Amino acid sequence: MNRVVFFLVIFVLVAVPIHAETVVRGRVFDNKGKKTVEFANVGVYRPDSKLVGACASDGDGNFEIKVHKNGDYQITVSFLGCGSWVKKIHCAGGELDLGKIRLKEDNEELDAAGIFAKTLIKKESDRIVYDVSADPDAARMNMSAFMSKVPGLKMSVRNGDLEYGHIPLEKILIDDKENDMISKSRQYPMSFIKADYMSKIELILPNSPEYNNAAPMLVITLDKPLPFGAAAQLTGYSSSHNSHDFTPDAVVNTPLIGIGLRYSFNYEDKPSLTNEYSRTSYSADGSAPSSFEGNSTSDSDSKGQNLNMNLFRTFMKDKLRFNASIGTNRQDSHERLETESSIMRPGQNEETTVTASTKATTSPFRLNAGFRANYDWRRGCGVTVKYTMRNSESSSYENLFRESSGDPLYNHSANSDLQHNISANLKFRDKNRKWGAKIETGYMFRDYNDRTEYWSGSIGGMDYNQGVAYTDAMVLGNLFKRKMGFSIGVKTEYVDNKGVDLTSSKSLDYNEFNLVPMVGISWIFLKDYKLSSSYICRSKRPRQEQLNPYSDTSDPYNIKTGNPDLKGEVSHSVSCGLQRNFKVKWLNQLTVNASYDVTPNAIQRISTVNEDNVRTTSYANIGRHSSSSVSLAGKFRPTDKIDLNVQVSHRRSRYEIYGEKTNTFNSFSLSENASFDLGFAQVGQSLLMLPTGVTAQSKDLRVEPLMDLTVSKYWEKANFGGTIGIEDALHGRSYMKSTIFSSGFVQETWTRRRGRMIYISLYWRIGKFRQTERVTHSSYDLN
């Protein structure tokens, strides 16, 4: 307990900052003084009209600029379609609050002063664009800190990565391509590179017609090649559930070659879990021939290592890029299970069975590799060739102990997965970004081998390979001065599967052809409204663990197995969303979304019970699965220090199981997260209320709350940060109830929670780059 108190005290201590500059603040309103203005351009000028600081107002109309030298200045605030506001100020250190700023109805003040407002930021149909070249702060700030100039985009104190509206970025692209120095998983170099290496930042909002992204992503356009130098990050994690992780990552960029290295080690030995269940099986006439009660106690531990290295090099003034990567990993795990089962039949004595099992699995080091080459002849136009190879193997030894057998029973399983993927991508975009096209073609090959030698002497498994040839094509464009964006695409694929079931010698060969279309649109209208709509068709092939016919009999009354006869599924999704931005202080945004999904040949997990009340769980193409949902999301800001996001949703799901039985149910969910800026630290809180144990056979869904609490701190000068948190703060080691049913049985399961967990995560960044001075730009227009 004393250690916990010590860490908490050390964690929140912070030195009092010394203000060496003047912080100028204000809040921008329209000419009527009623509505706040987002994305207003704010500039601070010297008496000779030289720009010394710039920013854009956020969703509440607030802005903040740091002026580094004392003296007299002139501040201007402008916005497209409105007049401008001009005021002379004197900076002498500390803070200068300009209060409420009303934009004027004309630009006479700017013209008289000889100042021409520069467009820093604008909002398009699917993105927010910031012109870095027009901001003098780019020469003083690093890339990571500069990102906060885009309203809503900032570095998460919790882990040091960028997020938008408390949502982590899905992807980071440099010049619209994957980059080996800076990416979603390697963001720390931006803390040591000046922002003037960028010319433009594009924050791509979710559901972009061009990128089809589910979460926000970032596209950075460079003004010059990234500098030579090195950076590294160390991250560590430890929890009260005996789960630990340590990951060092480093990147070096030299004139000869660039090298990236990443190593990770993890260890986990979580508390054991005890689950209880009861099951009643019914005969065809509705009588109950048997009832079943049981419990199982499981425990496991695992440790793993992962090592990856990538090499990269550019040629022809950064137009030609090469990347090669190699990696390997190892995983060792041990599982222990004890079960006790009691079955009651009418007119017979109760039968009790006690079993135990241990299982040791080793996945040895195997080589993974990849290669990528890009050539661009101008921004938005280029070709990419890519190859990846993934290789993994595992070997498991299982000991089964049963009262009836006496001696232990032994099973041995060996599994391997080898994948090759080669593709070529061509994209084209006109200079004005009014239209473009993308086409990608490739071939994927997967080789699955699963073999099990059972204690009985029988052999099971499969020898299975799959080839997929595909071509994707997309046309995209924008209308109405980029207020509307659209995309139309189609994917064709031919799937050829060949294999044999080792148990029955049955052929697993089959092939199929899929035509997968896609349409997307995003439209901003009436300034504060955004309409987005899409139709997406997706193909999905079964995973190896779903296909593997290995029969897990460690619990003889609850058997688990795969299904090598599974076929792929094709799903259709239609969605529509309406977003409304508000100019009131406490409410930023409301969004309504509606969607409908249907999968004619859905892959689902299905349980059946035989006449001995033995349950077998496997995967099957059950038939049609459809769902419709509607959600309402809001972004609130009760005070300048508190951000609050809330989303409520309702979903209606319908499963048609083998064309014989239909299961329809409704579910509700709630997600909420809040952040509190205390100055010396940031407090986070999140709440999820979701139904548990949802399957095609679910019944009587129950909504369970899950709350997390965090306290985070980042020391900017030391480039050090971390978080102390509590997961599942509302629960101890209590139970969650779920129910599944079919025409032949009903089962109730009480699953024990692991309960609240305290954890600490830390990260430290170091780096040094040789950086050139910024070249002054004479044009500030956005392309």
Spans of model-derived segments:
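Short, acidic, small-residue-rich periplasmic hinge/interaction motif at the N-terminus
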Residues: 41-43, 78-82, 96-136, 167-169
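N-terminal periplasmic accessory domains that precede
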Residues: 95-102, 116, 143-146, 162, ...
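Face-selective signature of the C-terminal outer-membrane beta-barrel domain
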Residues: 304-333, 357-502, 524, 528, ...
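Outer-membrane beta-barrel signature, preferentially recognizing the C-terminal barrel domain
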Residues: 510, 539-591, 617-628, 637, ...
